[in-house]
């Protein structure tokens, strides 16, 4: 089964393998998805820069892909990783560190 990229970018929810904690949300196009499969490291598509980026390429906070899950509509991906360092560019462990309720 493959993701359906016919409508463009797909959301990719990245979670930590051991804890299942949500680390970040990013977007993948087909090229980012294929590079992720090929390298076993996360690749995403930056909507603001309109280009691919490899998580941790400059910071060293890489994500080693352990598994990928596809939702029932084939239009969203869960990426299970072993995270090296913080996942968030702010230095926080997760991008979801602001509690609302």
Curated annotation (Swiss-Prot):
The gene it comes from is: hisI
How is the quaternary structure described?
A: Homodimer.
UniProt keyword Metal-binding present: yes
Name the predominant localization.
Answer: cytoplasm
User: What keywords would UniProt list here?
Assistant: Amino-acid biosynthesis, Cytoplasm, Histidine biosynthesis, Hydrolase, Magnesium, Metal-binding, Zinc
Enzyme class, UniProt record, top EC level: hydrolase
Query: What protein name is recorded for this chain?
Result: Phosphoribosyl-AMP cyclohydrolase
Catalytic activity annotation: 1-(5-phospho-beta-D-ribosyl)-5'-AMP + H2O = 1-(5-phospho-beta-D-ribosyl)-5-[(5-phospho-beta-D-ribosylamino)methylideneamino]imidazole-4-carboxamide
Q: Which residues bind Mg(2+)?
A: 71, 73, 75
Task: Indicate the transmembrane segments per the record.
Answer: none
Query: Which biological pathway?
Result: Amino-acid biosynthesis; L-histidine biosynthesis; L-histidine from 5-phospho-alpha-D-ribose 1-diphosphate: step 3/9
